[in-house]
């Protein structure tokens, strides 16, 4: 039985050493090129991509000008009850509001002030989210029947997710209380965060203060 399985794996280009959840054999598949400039360059004669297969490109890696990894992730984080299209409309509407507000401020500014005003809403949003990245997180650790909130360092992808989640929760609470629409609150929060201001920045600072207060429990990490 084992011999037959090995022969089948060799015929079908399936690796018998890698995880079964990996559909691409690393011996014969390579990552796709998603950069437009790289795609236009000819391959060298000895480039292995001339002889091997390429993996299917992920849907969020499409090399088009209106797609952005951070914005796509924000759309997914803001999705509620599977209504991704509604989330997309809210996020893109927030970016449009940012564009209008920034252009209005730019039109009224002096020539010197115009240089410091960013008109690209994607850059404003990404800067705001970046400023909200927490450096630490609190995680429950049980010792002797007692659970302690222990501060842990945080990796960049999780920091980005937590920044988006904090901003999303703040916007949802404020919109639920009838202050204004979600898209308007999100635009305001992104603009404020790009200047290191706003409720999300305050939430991040409060988290850091709590982590600092709980640093005595840091030895529970091990």
From Swiss-Prot:
Pfam families: Ribosomal_S7
Keywords from the named record: Mitochondrion, Ribonucleoprotein, Ribosomal protein, Transit peptide
Transit peptide: 1-14
GO cellular component terms listed in the entry, alphabetical order: mitochondrial small ribosomal subunit; ribosome
Any one GO molecular-function label of the UniProt entry: structural constituent of ribosome
One GO-annotated biological process of the protein: mitochondrial translation
Subunit structure: Component of the mitochondrial ribosome small subunit (28S) which comprises a 12S rRNA and about 30 distinct proteins.
Family note: Belongs to the universal ribosomal protein uS7 family.
Name of the protein in question: Small ribosomal subunit protein uS7m
Organism for this UniProt entry: Caenorhabditis elegans
């Amino acid at each position: 039985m084992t011999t037959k399985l090995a022969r089948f794996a060799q015929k079908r280009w399936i690796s018998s050493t890698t995880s079964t959840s990996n559909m691409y054999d690393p011996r014969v598949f390579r990552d796709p090129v998603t950069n437009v400039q790289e795609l236009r360059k000819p391959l060298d004669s000895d480039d292995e991509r001339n002889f091997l297969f390429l993996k299917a490109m992920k849907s969020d890696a499409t090399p088009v000008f209106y797609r952005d990894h951070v914005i796509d992730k924000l759309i997914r984080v803001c999705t509620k009850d599977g209504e991704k299209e509604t989330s997309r409309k809210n996020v893109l509407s927030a970016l449009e509001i940012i564009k209008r507000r920034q252009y209005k401020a730019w039109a009224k500014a002096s020539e010197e002030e115009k240089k410091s005003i960013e008109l690209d809403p994607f850059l404003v949003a990404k800067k705001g989210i970046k400023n909200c990245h927490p450096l630490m997180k609190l995680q429950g650790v049980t010792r002797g029947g007692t659970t302690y909130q222990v501060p842990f360092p945080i990796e960049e992808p999780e920091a980005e997710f937590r920044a988006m989640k904090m901003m999303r929760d703040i916007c949802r609470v404020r919109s639920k209380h009838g202050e204004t629409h979600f898209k308007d609150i999100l635009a305001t929060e992104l603009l404020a965060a790009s200047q290191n201001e706003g409720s999300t920045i305050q939430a991040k600072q409060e988290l850091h203060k709590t982590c600092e207060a709980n640093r005595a429990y840091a030895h529970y990490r091990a």
